[in-house]
């Protein structure tokens, strides 16, 4: 085991507009090439579109969308005696959030709307209604874990 102290997770500053750490993380996931101001514009525009269409608070819809995309179990590859098994494991809360945000952004990028803000808004609305590509990704991961339940005793 290493003798050095374990490095803790960095504190993230909440975003300036809504004062939310979750939103600040989401902005960082959207950001490309260090262009944070562009990422902020995309997120805020998407949240405005969502609030306009849903008639609910911005962050409530975002939280609902992320709740419907968060995975509870995933599979990890484990090599046992020459063969590799897909072992189902529970997902830590921090990783759940990270995966949900990543899947939501990936699904939004694959959509067909004109701007990224509209794509993200559409995917958030779909995810909050429990449909869409990001939710399908979560269902696939859960299905994979369910199919490999027999190897759960290899967990570490």
From Swiss-Prot:
Supply the alphabetized keyword list: Ribonucleoprotein, Ribosomal protein, RNA-binding, rRNA-binding, tRNA-binding
Gene Ontology cellular component terms for the protein in this record: small ribosomal subunit
Look up the domain of life of the source: Bacteria
Q: Which residues are in coiled coils?
A: none
| A biological process from GO | translation
Under the heading CDD domains, the entry gives: uS7_Bacteria
Q: Which InterPro entries match?
A: Ribosomal_uS7, Ribosomal_uS7_bac/org-type, Ribosomal_uS7_CS, Ribosomal_uS7_dom, Ribosomal_uS7_dom_sf
GO MF, one term, reads:
tRNA binding
Q: Does the keyword Kinase apply?
A: no
Keyword Ribosomal protein (UniProt) = yes
Q: Which family does it belong to?
A: Belongs to the universal ribosomal protein uS7 family.
State how it assembles: Part of the 30S ribosomal subunit. Contacts proteins S9 and S11.
Per the entry, what this protein does is: One of the primary rRNA binding proteins, it binds directly to 16S rRNA where it nucleates assembly of the head domain of the 30S subunit. Is located at the subunit interface close to the decoding center, probably blocks exit of the E-site tRNA.
Q: What is this protein called?
A: Small ribosomal subunit protein uS7
Source species of the chain: Shewanella amazonensis (strain ATCC BAA-1098 / SB2B)
Kindly list the organism's lineage: Bacteria, Pseudomonadati, Pseudomonadota, Gammaproteobacteria, Alteromonadales
By which gene is this protein encoded? Answer: rpsG
